[in-house]
Amino acid sequence: MPKVFLVKRRSLGVSVRSWDELPDEKRADTYIPVGLGRLLHDPPEDCRSDGGSSSGSGSSSAGEPGGAESSSSPHAPESETPEPGDAEGPDGHLATKQRPVARSKIKFTTGTCSDSVVHSCDLCGKGFRLQRMLNRHLKCHNQVKRHLCTFCGKGFNDTFDLKRHVRTHTGIRPYKCNVCNKAFTQRCSLESHLKKIHGVQQQYAYKQRRDKLYVCEDCGYTGPTQEDLYLHVNSAHPGSSFLKKTSKKLAALLQGKLTSAHQENTSLSEEEERK
């Protein structure tokens, strides 16, 4: 097989770099971890007390196996790892030199839930503080999708997920960027765009509720209140299913506002006719 197709595997182990290979002008540009620098420049207390005897012992151990390797480069980091029985010196450092370990990004938990988590899922073990949150989570394990998309037939367990998906078909993007006029289907996408692209930091606290935006799913109209949305849908889309889902109390309240507004308009028109 030609050498072009041969792939050389890199060793996963951490290789110890010899400082003797670098010239003096390049040693200043080499990165040295802080923890390793302390071990290199601050020898243990027992080494300080010996004084010149440490150098003599280093030369005498050159004949022993491994002695020449340790005395060849005083600045070379040791590849030994601390044993469980190693003791700490007075300055808090281990008596034996150790290889610097990279900080892991994996978070380890004790496996115990707090007292606030009282409702847990029997299928996956996830915990929730409220029963309604658990009920909503259980829908994701249900194989039957109750809410279907009328455009492509894809099923969802939640109406919110269905609404978010339908906007990809209708092209309704109610959340617009004030800087570049780019529009998004979700508020979180707009906030992420402002932070990453324009560097705009949001002025709300963690988990603080934002001002809700009421969106007409038929034409993309946005209103600050549900009443404004109801008035718009009632006038522009009388046959919309949104009117059927609206509560009777809100419908009666808004219907009274509609009649009062209609009466005001008729009274103004009558006054204009009299003039």
UniProtKB/Swiss-Prot annotation:
Q: What is this protein called?
A: Transcription factor Ovo-like 2
SUBUNIT field: Interacts (via zinc-finger domains) with CEBPA (via bZIP domain); the interaction inhibits the transcription factor activity of CEBPA and is required to repress adipogenesis.
Question: Looking at the keywords, is Transcription present?
Answer: yes
Which family, according to the similarity comment? Belongs to the krueppel C2H2-type zinc-finger protein family.
Chain residue ranges for the region called Disordered: 15-101
Q: Which Pfam families match?
A: zf-C2H2 (PF00096), zf-C2H2_4 (PF13894), zf-C2H2_6 (PF13912)
Q: Where are the zinc fingers (C2H2-type)?
A: 119-141, 147-169, 175-198, 214-237
Entry keywords, A to Z: Corneal dystrophy, Developmental protein, DNA-binding, Metal-binding, Nucleus, Phosphoprotein, Repeat, Transcription, Transcription regulation, Zinc, Zinc-finger
User: What does the function comment of this entry state?
Assistant: Zinc-finger transcription repressor factor. Plays a critical role in maintaining the identity of epithelial lineages by suppressing epithelial-to mesenchymal transition (EMT) mainly through the repression of ZEB1, an EMT inducer. Positively regulates neuronal differentiation. Suppresses cell cycling and terminal differentiation of keratinocytes by directly repressing MYC and NOTCH1. Important for the correct development of primordial germ cells in embryos. Plays dual functions in thermogenesis and adipogenesis to maintain energy balance.
What's a single GO MF annotation on this record? DNA-binding transcription repressor activity, RNA polymerase II-specific
List, as start-end ranges, the regions of compositional bias called Acidic residues.
80-89
Tell me the superkingdom of the source: Eukaryota
Q: Which residues does the record list as Phosphoserine (modified residue)?
A: 269
Name the organs or tissues of expression: Expressed in testis, ovary, heart and skeletal muscle. Expressed in the cornea, but absent from the corneal endothelium.
Give the location in the cell. Answer: Nucleus
Where does this protein come from, organism-wise?
A: Homo sapiens (Human)
Question: InterPro entries of this UniProt entry?
Answer: Ovo-like (IPR027756), Znf_C2H2_sf (IPR036236), Znf_C2H2_type (IPR013087)
